[in-house]
Regions:
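Short SAM/SAH-binding signature in class I
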Residues: 58-67, 87
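C-terminal substrate-binding/active-site "lid" region of AdoMet-derived donor-dependent transferases
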Residues: 77-133, 137
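Conserved S-adenosyl-L-methionine
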Residues: 11-18, 82-84
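Conserved SAM-dependent methyltransferase scaffold
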Residues: 6-7
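Short, small-residue-biased leader/transition segments that mark boundaries at the very start
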Residues: 1-2
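S-adenosyl-L-methionine
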Residues: 19-60
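Conserved hydrophobic residues forming the short capping helix/wall of the S-adenosyl-L-methionine
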Residues: 13, 34-35, 105
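A short, conserved alpha-helix within the catalytic core of class I
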Residues: 70-78
Length: 147
């Protein structure tokens, strides 16, 4: 299911409010459909780019970045200007993104880097082997003014 991170966050925090920011029109449509289908009523879907929309949102407790299309440095700069400390989680798939996020977050308070490996089994003769998918790195840290 495409764009599932926002819905997963919403289901984990049913009394919280999730703001999902997306700039691609097709992805916006899919996200809205998935929210309706899965009754994720506490998700507000916003059209735009995160680096543009972030300043218009209420100050968050947590931020998840599932992709930034090259805007991570600007998004991080805005997060560092928030008036309170927030939990920041960033997923990085490509080597370029992993290197960039590692460099930009290397001095972040409480930084954790968590490699996530997944795969699917497939049959080879009478055996089953695990066909790995690309690893993803999750970066978790504290950001904002009081960090």
């Amino acid at each position: 299911m495409y764009k599932r991170q926002s819905i997963t966050c919403a289901k984990c925090c049913p009394y919280g409010q999730v703001y999902a920011v997306e700039y691609q029109e097709q992805a916006l449509d899919i996200l809205r459909q998935n929210c309706a289908y899965l009754q994720a009523e506490n998700v507000t879907v916003l059209a735009g780019r995160a680096e543009t929309v972030l300043s218009e949102l209420p100050v968050p407790d947590c931020i998840f970045i599932g992709g930034s299309n090259g805007a991570f440095p600007e998004i991080l700069r805005q997060i560092q200007q928030l008036p309170k400390s927030v939990r920041l989680v960033v997923s990085a798939v490509t080597l370029e993104t992993q290197a960039e996020v590692t460099q930009l977050l290397q001095d972040a308070p409480q930084l954790e880097i968590i490699p996530v490996f997944s795969g699917q089994s497939r049959k080879v003769g009478r055996y089953h082997v695990l066909q790995p998918y690309h690893p993803v790195l999750l970066f978790a840290c504290t950001g904002g003014k009081s960090s």
